[in-house]
């Protein structure tokens, strides 16, 4: 299997992050998670084709990079994007990833996570701008395997 095909397979499980752009019925909402006192922002994600750069040993290896730019939807509207990168630390696809959610006319939310191939990712919210200038919290990204997924960001009050 070629590097690009392998990168596509890995990236499908990578994150905030990374399959063929496909449209399906979008859904998203913003609500309160009363059990933890956090405000939850939920988005339908349309993953893009990732860009894979093989910088280390040929094939997956330390120093390889994947960059992504995905669309975030709320209802039937695109409300922002998710952009970022993952740097591989070994041939298994274990990666250090970081990204930024940009919500149109609202600001940004920065996040980071350790990536492995499972479709469920746990994110740390590390900051933001605009309406999210004091953003802290955590979140999840779940990939559906069809080029779509769900991003949930739980912001501390």
Q: Where do the language-model regions lie?
A:
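Targeting-peptide/extracellular-domain and disordered-appendage signature
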Residues: 2-13, 17-157
């Amino acid at each position: 299997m070629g590097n690009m095909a392998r990168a596509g397979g890995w990236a499908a499980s990578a994150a905030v992050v990374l399959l063929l752009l496909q449209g399906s019925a979008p859904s998203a909402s913003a609500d309160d998670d009363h059990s933890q006192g956090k405000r939850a922002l939920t988005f339908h994600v349309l993953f893009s084709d990732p860009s894979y750069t093989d910088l280390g040993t040929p094939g997956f290896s330390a120093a390889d990079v994947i960059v992504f730019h995905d669309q975030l939807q709320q209802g039937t509207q695109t409300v922002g994007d998710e952009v970022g990168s993952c740097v591989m630390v070994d041939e298994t696809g274990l990666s250090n990833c970081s990204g930024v959610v940009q919500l149109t006319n609202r600001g940004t939310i920065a996040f980071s996570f350790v990536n492995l191939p499972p479709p469920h990712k746990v994110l740390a919210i590390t900051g933001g701008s605009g309406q999210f200038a004091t953003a802290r919290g955590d979140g999840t990204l779940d990939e559906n395997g069809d080029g779509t997924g769900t991003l949930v960001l739980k912001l501390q009050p």
